[in-house]
From Swiss-Prot:
Subunit composition and interactions: DNA polymerase III contains a core (composed of alpha, epsilon and theta chains) that associates with a tau subunit. This core dimerizes to form the PolIII' complex. PolIII' associates with the gamma complex (composed of gamma, delta, delta', psi and chi chains) and with the beta chain to form the complete DNA polymerase III complex.
Principal subcellular localization: cytoplasm
Protein name: DNA polymerase III subunit alpha
Pfam families named in the record: DNA_pol3_alpha (PF07733), DNA_pol3_finger (PF17657), HHH_6 (PF14579), PHP (PF02811), tRNA_anti-codon (PF01336)
CC terms in the record's Gene Ontology section: cytoplasm
Organism expressing this protein natively: Staphylococcus aureus (strain NCTC 8325 / PS 47)
Family annotation (NCBIfam families): polc (TIGR00594)
GO biological process entries: DNA replication
One MF annotation (Gene Ontology) recorded for this entry: 3'-5' exonuclease activity
Function per UniProt: DNA polymerase III is a complex, multichain enzyme responsible for most of the replicative synthesis in bacteria. This DNA polymerase also exhibits 3' to 5' exonuclease activity. The alpha chain is the DNA polymerase.
EC number(s) per entry: 2.7.7.7
EC class (word): transferase
Amino acid sequence: MVAYLNIHTAYDLLNSSLKIEDAVRLAVSENVDALAITDTNVLYGFPKFYDACIANNIKPIFGMTIYVTNGLNTVETVVLAKNNDGLKDLYQLSSEIKMNALEHVSFELLKRFSNNMIIIFKKVGDQHRDIVQVFETHNDTYMDHLSISIQGRKHVWIQNVCYQTRQDADTISALAAIRDNTKLDLIHDQEDFGAHFLTEKEINQLDINQEYLTQVDVIAQKCDAELKYHQSLLPQYETPNDESAKKYLWRVLVTQLKKLELNYDVYLERLKYEYKVITNMGFEDYFLIVSDLIHYAKTNDVMVGPGRGSSAGSLVSYLLGITTIDPIKFNLLFERFLNPERVTMPDIDIDFEDTRRERVIQYVQEKYGELHVSGIVTFGHLLARAVARDVGRIMGFDEVTLNEISSLIPHKLGITLDEAYQIDDFKEFVHRNHRHERWFSICKKLEGLPRHTSTHAAGIIINDHPLYEYAPLTKGDTGLLTQWTMTEAERIGLLKIDFLGLRNLSIIHQILTQVKKDLGINIDIEKIPFDDQKVFELLSQGDTTGIFQLESDGVRSVLKKLKPEHFEDIVAVTSLYRPGPMEEIPTYITRRHDPSKVQYLHPHLEPILKNTYGVIIYQEQIMQIASTFANFSYGEADILRRAMSKKNRAVLESERQHFIEGAKQNGYHEDISKQIFDLILKFADYGFPRAHAVSYSKIAYIMSFLKVHYPNYFYANILSNVIGSEKKTAQMIEEAKKQGITILPPNINESHWFYKPSQEGIYLSIGTIKGVGYQSVKVIVDERYQNGKFKDFFDFARRIPKRVKTRKLLEALILVGAFDAFGKTRSTLLQAIDQVLDGDLNIEQDGFLFDILTPKQMYEDKEELPDALISQYEKEYLGFYVSQHPVDKKFVAKQYLTIFKLSNAQNYKPILVQFDKVKQIRTKNGQNMAFVTLNDGIETLDGVIFPNQFKKYEELLSHNDLFIVSGKFDHRKQQRQLIINEIQTLATFEEQKLAFAKQIIIRNKSQIDMFEEMIKATKENANDVVLSFYDETIKQMTTLGYINQKDSMFNNFIQSFNPSDIRLI
């Protein structure tokens, strides 16, 4: 046997560039019979290594490289598992090293795990004799061919392998530079470290002692460990009174079924079927474990989602409280979740509110033990964009060049360097000089290597034994992790449950808590009506900002066209709005509004597709069609659905014949059977799990219900979840204002870090103020809670510590209106800052010296700041306007000019706006144009100014002013935009309107008498304007006479009316 006993794979992170598949490929080409994986301190690569070796008839040997110390000296050591007990010892030894961040292993620790291992000390010198002698009674201790001779110790040839060929030596230098954040030595980076995969010819040229080579085979023969997959490693659930899990589960299910007011016989029949499948598969403990942790969450104030994935198709899950979706009511299939004809572990993923997810994980750790619960490792890789920058950095490329590299590689998921090389600009960069070609060569060699570890976002492993008995562990940022990925851990047989954090559940929970506290209303989301017409009106208007699954522009557009009337409409929309099935949306909407257009390929499809108007939307429908037509069991139907989605030609052909034959036996003609099969094949890729759609649509409906009935609370909590994002905050503030909600400035006696809902509106978060950090807010709020509300500005200044009470903080709070409630103008408070900063207001507050030593604070009353300045400061410190937006305020004053808002404007009507953003670009023809963002004080809208108009108005756009724009509304990427045709300043527009108006319409005649002399019965010259009165009570217009525009009193006449009572046409 020829073997390599010291292979370092790429999972020896940033120490080796040798991919597992390349090591095995080389072994095959060189007729190597066995390979030992010996990464330093870790066992990350074991499963992939084992699979690759077995697939290529290579004997896998499991090992690890460690550094053993006696406290004075350290020796590199390779340990190999002789058997499966030795493999378990490797798991535990690696776990000890990684969990405790050990750089070196004491010989005492190694001795604990050495009985079933082969130990090979490397490069042993005189200084290492003491370490080697410790293991003199260990029969399988060796020294490598470079070690000194020690009596009684055998030598073995062992070659360290870290890269493929001599030409790949530069990868080790590059990886070391990336790891250590240093620069690559371009002169010595190709130095051969003698750590490549030696060919048979190269080995023969080394003149190795034959006895050393013989020992290689001896060691390889001794190693017979193997990974065991699909073990039954489910933990056992502790039942009361040691009752069997099966009996306990049945008793709980029947008890719960009797509590529910359901059709007992129908539900009992389904329950018996599911229970039989679950227990026959041996999964009763699984359901009890999941039920227990969800019960803990719900009884400890942690909101849990209604369900996720296919688990909502299980009645057992519903009765155990794992889901809140009745699978019979919603026509969900158990086999989509757990297929009796395809035995796999159930996969129940659970959504918890994201702010309290850790509480449930902590419960599981306490219940099962710290070493029995862990997260799961994931790996970050040196993908194209990452490796390009990393290698560029270590080669000393400047930031400009690094940015050029980033810009040349497309932002495409999974893009490779080979794909980027097909782009002419990237190819030109590579061949610009020899240095760039060298860079590209190194990048290509490193591309795809694992770079670092991180934690899987949701997966938690649970066992009733210490996990290191089945898999090695490591330490992550938040606790223990398996060293193997999610699929590898599951394949071993370990129980994995996804604990997902869902922000929307946190929002719902906060709303419910605040409504109960403030209004005394206890909202039970399981009892709200799911046919609330106000909810469907909201959805039909597309007012779904902030609503789970429904807030994208595309979905809002679909909702407006569909006009949902039932919960099923929401389920359909969330399932259809995805790549693929989106093309069926127009058909679905048309048929939904006109059911007469629904057509079925065969009448027996109608019961299955009636609710979706003849469109196949759900995976469950595919299974039902296979069952109805071909007499498939639902288990067989699920296998058919999976085969269709994987597009395996051979399997599909077999399933096609199976389907047609079954349909024939069921009485269907072969032609219709083929058509039905092709129909479901077409939709197999598109089909969405209905159970998941129902579960997530329930969350969407609940949020819609809360938005309709408790809007202040809804928006306050949505806003609290976007603190820190000025753009999202401004968007949500704008949306709330459009819904008629009053946005109140931060209030020093009411506001917190989060937004606070009230009957009057929503108090802004103090945390939204630029320059006011979380710790400052915490000090202010804590002081308020402990010692009561602040009485005035001076009281606030006296009670807040100096370290917080800076001029910057005080100015920010004043200028956004946080002290407005004290009845002093903002300018007055700004004047008072010097007093509170110059005087020592932190003298012993409760002592009698305070009144004596503290000078009397007096306000020097000042007139309020101009409105424009107030608005300017609010925008500066908050990113948006709290007081009336300048455009909105001006609109009220100038509405007599017959101007419009963005929301109600039509093509080419004058709209009053402010330009929030102007982005100038150059067209392919070299002409300038611009994309702009318009703001009317309530709404923002994108606009485009094409070259001809841009040339005309470019100078005007440089002014910070209010403008009247007009143009044509259009849609771009499903978003409404304005193609701007004309731009004027408001002042110019007003001047022209007053000069050239053709008609004046009033709806209040109370001012007429004052200007009786101006009004003439007939038109006498070209400057005369028609004066009309519109009577709103009878909806009728009458002519009152004419007024001359040149009359000196003309402007006085116009201004005498309330702007809402007069219009110039």
